[in-house]
Amino acid sequence: MRAIIETVFDIFYLVTVLTVGIRMICGSKAGTQFRLFGLMAVVLGAGDSFHLVPRALALCTTGLESYAMPLGLGKWITSVTMTVFYVLLYYVWRKRYQIEGQQNVTAAVYALSAVRVVLCMMPQNQWLTNHTPLAWGILRNIPFALLGLLIIVLFYHSAKQNNDKAFRWMWLTIVLSFGFYIPVVLWADVNPLIGMLMIPKTCAYVWTVLIGYNAMKAETGKQN
């Protein structure tokens, strides 16, 4: 039953974010915040598919243990694409609120992203095995969490300052995604049921994408 529920949910998630992302790309002008948002959604869905598709196959066939290499490779790829996702989200923030300058913030985003990617590339992660070291799981997620925290602060203050009702909950979607993700990193190996928190984490990302899509529809409607 768990295999069926997870598989159906993952298919729904991937189809939703990829469809919304493609529609945003096709329905927006080049160089706009919504074109960037659409690209961000496609990166999210495409990156997650490298992990979720092998996971669905594993759950519906011989089990996770038999798919250690494709699952590990998928997690590896996803760890990088999620970093790219937040870099793109940072530029959505800059475009939406017409931010000029603030090179220190940009430098921090790139520095945290670079450290995260470098840590993900280290062989000590043992991505392609069934048992990845917890210490490295924590280590590579420290810069990722700091990057997320920075994006949370930026969207919270800018949405509040500009009375941006469309994006007023963007910061909360990121808080929720990390809130559900961190326990999985820390304790999923001890208690596999904690891994189920990835479902509400995924829902938080769907909310993120829908915020951008609904804002695009609303603002396009006003222009017409």
Question: Model-found features: residue ranges?
Answer:
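A cytosolic-side transmembrane-helix exit/cap motif
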Residues: 56-61, 129, 155-160, 188-194, ...
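Hydrophobic transmembrane alpha-helical segments in integral membrane proteins
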Residues: 1-18
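Terminal transmembrane helical module of multi-pass membrane proteins
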Residues: 171-217
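Internal transmembrane alpha-helix with an interfacial aromatic "cap," most often the third helix
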Residues: 21-27, 50-106, 120-122, 155, ...
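Alpha-helical transmembrane segments in multipass membrane proteins, preferentially the mid-helix core
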Residues: 17-26, 87-93, 118-123, 142-168, ...
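Alpha-helical transmembrane segments of multi-pass integral membrane proteins
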Residues: 39-53, 74-91, 103-124, 139-151, ...
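Non-cytosolic membrane-interface motifs at loop->transmembrane helix junctions
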Residues: 3-6, 64-76, 129-142, 191-201
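Membrane-interface helix-boundary motifs at transmembrane edges
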Residues: 26-37, 93-105, 130-133, 156-168, ...
